[in-house]
Amino acid sequence: NYSTLKGAKLDYKKQLNTLQNTEKSLNIQHRQLCYNLTSAFERFNIQKQNVEVTQRVFDNISKKYQYGMASSMEVTTAGTDLVSVQSSYVQALLDFVNAQIELEKLLNK
């Protein structure tokens, strides 16, 4: 029957469009998740460096304090800065792991 064949062709075209749209959507999502992972990794590395620098500053101020060349307020401020930077580092690590998980979920790994 001609109308049945025509209807089947129309359904086929609809399904093909749906498939193509899904592929495009998945490709866009993949690119976005790759970008998110790269950005999270860069932030993680920056925060890691910040922790290293802030730790050195704290250590130096602590040594100065031992020799009477720095106040307890300076040690407290450096310690607070170190804790803050460590917190940012942990958050960056968490963001990186979450970005990796999201990409792996998309890739079914």
Regions found by a protein language model. Name each.
Residues 6, 77, 98:
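Solvent-exposed, flexible loop/coil residues
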Residues 1-52:
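Sec/SRP-type N-terminal targeting helices
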Residues 34, 38, 90, 97:
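Conserved active-site region of classical short-chain dehydrogenase/reductase
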Residues 42-91, 104-105:
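Charged, solvent-exposed structural "stalk/scaffold" segments
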